[in-house]
Curated annotation (Swiss-Prot):
Coiled coil: none
Disulfide-linked positions: C250-C291
E.C. number: 3.4.22.-
Top-rank EC class of the record's enzyme: hydrolase
A GO MF term: cysteine-type peptidase activity
Glycosylation sites: N206
The species this protein was found in: Theileria parva
Protein name per UniProt: Cysteine proteinase
InterPro entries in alphabetical order: Papain-like_cys_pep_sf, Pept_asp_AS, Pept_cys_AS, Pept_his_AS, Peptidase_C1A, Peptidase_C1A_C, Peptidase_C1A_papain-like, Prot_inhib_I29
Lineage of source species: Eukaryota, Sar, Alveolata, Apicomplexa, Aconoidasida
Family indicated by similarity: Belongs to the peptidase C1 family.
Positions annotated as propeptide: 61-229
Amino acid sequence: MYSSSVVSNPNERLVNNRVENDLESSDDTLSTQAKPVSRLLTRKLLLGVVVLFFLAGVSVVSYFLFSKYKMLNKFKRELDDHLTKDFPNLERSKRDTCFDELTRLFGDGFLSDDPKLEYEVYREFEEFNSKYNRRHATQQERLNRLVTFRSNYLEVKEQKGDEPYVKGINRFSDLTEREFYKLFPVMKPPKATYSNGYYLLSHMANKTYLKNLKKALNTDEDVDLAKLTGENLDWRRSSSVTSVKDQSNCGGCWAFSTVGSVEGYYMSHFDKSYELSVQELLDCDSFSNGCQGGLLESAYEYVRKYGLVSAKDLPFVDKARRCSVPKAKKVSVPSYHVFKGKEVMTRSLTSSPCSVYLSVSPELAKYKSGVFTGECGKSLNHAVVLVGEGYDEVTKKRYWVVQNSWGTDWGENGYMRLERTNMGTDKCGVLDTSMSAFEL
């Protein structure tokens, strides 16, 4: 017996099946129609989001451009007022050039919104160009130099006095770090040469040397050469150091250091004052490369073998030329030695002003006065003359006295006091290698 809910009539079953099929077909149709609608809504939503982001971006850019426009106009107005009020006699052409260059750099984002400060930097830059005879090939090069100079000038201006040395503006102030190191390629120092203590003591035992040594040590007492260390010795006290020289744009520090040391040797040992020709070394030392760099060892060997004429007979011309030496009196050295480490102080410096290598850096190049404790270069790349050692009462630091060849407007009238660290080859590698002239 079947349930009453079961349809037994075939016709009725057929009708029911058709109804069910129609309902399923209707559902499929609705589903098919809903999909395009859903896609359309999704696309409209995405388009709306894109439009909103675009409008937001346009608004931000517009706001930025408008703000930049307002700031530029404000800078122009304040700069114009500053020039008109505080510099009424400024030539019109110079005023226009200054105004155009500063507003251009401000618009490019290189300057602050303080026109008084920026014009101060600008005036210092103009004085710098005049002092060091700078010429710029294009306006873009000039503006690039101004931006670099500005960075160095503000670093000097904003010193807080926390360091025991003072920075200053000098010939390197418009150079980038990369350009600076290009001027000072790595130098390879020679190996030490053997010399026993008795040999060194015997050559120093002459009256002229002992007289000058006592002056250099600032003492009237007799000096025990066997215990001589080099501390508190300054060859400038005995007038055993010749004048500061200027290598200008020539990378000939190796020649200047050699000549300065040889001149110091004759002053300290024989009271003979010479101004020898750096140019002869630049022109004629075939193992070096003139103003592109050279070797101290090669320079000393040239002086030993051939000697040097005076600077008056063959003056420095800021470039290397074909070797042509006039017939004139020559000064040579009988011998020379290379020292390393502590012997740079105890044997080389105690004998006379000596040539040493340094690892110089852009920070060191900014030095103006005080005891330099700043960052050195990573490799030996410069040669100078070591003339003494001392102690600074203010900073409570010991230091080395170095004569540079960057002119008297650099450092302390051409000299530098370099912190003595007593670590390794000491500050900036000053104790790495030295060379000194000696008697046979």
